[in-house]
A protein has these predicted regions:
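Amphipathic, interaction-prone secondary-structure segments
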Residues: 72-102
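Short coil-to-beta transition motif at edge beta-strands of beta-rich domains
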Residues: 2-18, 24
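Intrinsically disordered, low-complexity regulatory segments enriched in Ser/Thr/Pro
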Residues: 90-125
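SH3/SH3-like beta-barrel fold
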Residues: 35-45
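Short intrinsically disordered terminal tails
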Residues: 1-2, 140-146
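Short beta-strand-centered aromatic/proline hotspots
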Residues: 19-37
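Intrinsically disordered, low-complexity, charged/polar segments
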Residues: 46-74, 118-142
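Short linear proline/tyrosine/threonine-rich motifs used for host-factor recruitment
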Residues: 39, 49-51, 85
């Protein structure tokens, strides 16, 4: 189940019970009183359709190393277990969680520095919409696509 209060229009989410051909959904509208989410469903065959679902039926789209690599994130060359995304004027690192496969600890690095001692560490994130919220907060014009 997803927390409807954390969602924003444009966030990427997924259904709790996926069916064949379904990939993910893009939030188009929210009604927090009724708990309904209007979303665009995206299918593997490039098809799309509008749908309305209860927030109980939806869940966050999970982050993964493969998804991050497909969006341009890469491991550092010095062998550290950190995925880096370089954006001007900051660098963002994502350290995989020791407890969960889908969770990451974001670190914010000034300029092009990749030393952990220069970083600002943040709370663990688990989904694409949480990472997108951080990127938007830092005013980076980057969209994470599944």
């Amino acid at each position: 189940m997803i927390n409807i209060i954390e969602l924003r229009i444009g966030d990427i989410i997924t259904k709790e019970n996926k069916y064949e051909g379904y990939k993910y959904s893009i939030v188009e509208g929210l009604d927090s009183l009724s708990g309904k989410i209007r979303h665009k469903e995206v299918y593997e065959g490039r098809g799309r359709q509008m749908a309305i679902s209860s927030f109980v039926d939806m869940s966050p789209y999970p982050l993964s190393v493969e998804l991050l690599k497909a969006n341009g994130w890469q491991y550092s060359l010095d062998g550290e277990n950190v995925l880096f995304g370089e954006f001007k004027p900051i660098t963002i690192g994502l350290i995989p969680s020791a407890e969960f496969d889908y969770a990451f600890n974001p670190i914010l690095l000034p300029g092009c520095s990749k030393r952990k001692r220069d970083a600002i560490f943040m709370y663990e994130i688990e989904s694409v919409h949480e990472l997108q919220a951080l990127l938007d907060m830092w005013r980076l014009n980057v969209k994470i696509k599944p």
